[in-house]
Amino acid sequence: MNTYQNVEAITRMVLEAMEAGKTEKPRIKVPIGISARHIHLTQEDVEKLFGEGYQLTKRSELMGGQFASNEQCTIVGLKLRAIENVRILGPVRSKSQVEISATDARTLGVKAPTRQSGDIAGSAPIALVGPKGAIYLKEGCIVAARHIHMPPADAEVAGFKDGDMVSVRMGDERGALLEQVKIRVDESFTLEMHIDTDEANAAQLKTGDAVVIK
């Protein structure tokens, strides 16, 4: 290859790299929110656990119109292993579900699949015990899949749409690259990535720390 061909080849490589750079999404920093085990209930199940006509009472506001309630109950696995004081989130939903970590699943002795919230078809059974009664869910116990909440304005700037899957670099010395992180876009959201306690502990992260979308 002569000098002219060398220059031509290098020029072509540079132009291709520049063109690729134009389509590359910007590196977005996202604050972390650590999601502890929690419960979503139908109004019918609220009343079974807490009494007829009972309404959940608000403890603190969460994004997306949700709130952490003052109410808690005990969850019980198939081998009668229990975890007490699991918080209930409101408002009530059309189907009851329990979201736990993989460590919780082992503690309870349940085979909870990793799913996005609301995707409970064929998931693990679980029992819930409240002050006024108990319920048994034939399905509804899941390990919540990691995801990023993003308002439309941020999604537009970053070039993402609802349902996109991304990779995220998290942590420093004991950091990790998490793949298959789902982008969820909604007007009610603020920018935040939700991970469970297992993932946070593995990367030594705390609420408010930032991760980077790759």
Feature-to-residue mapping (PLM):
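Short, low-complexity, charged amphipathic interaction modules
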Residues: M1-E24
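Short structural boundary motif marking the start of a folded domain
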Residues: P26-V30
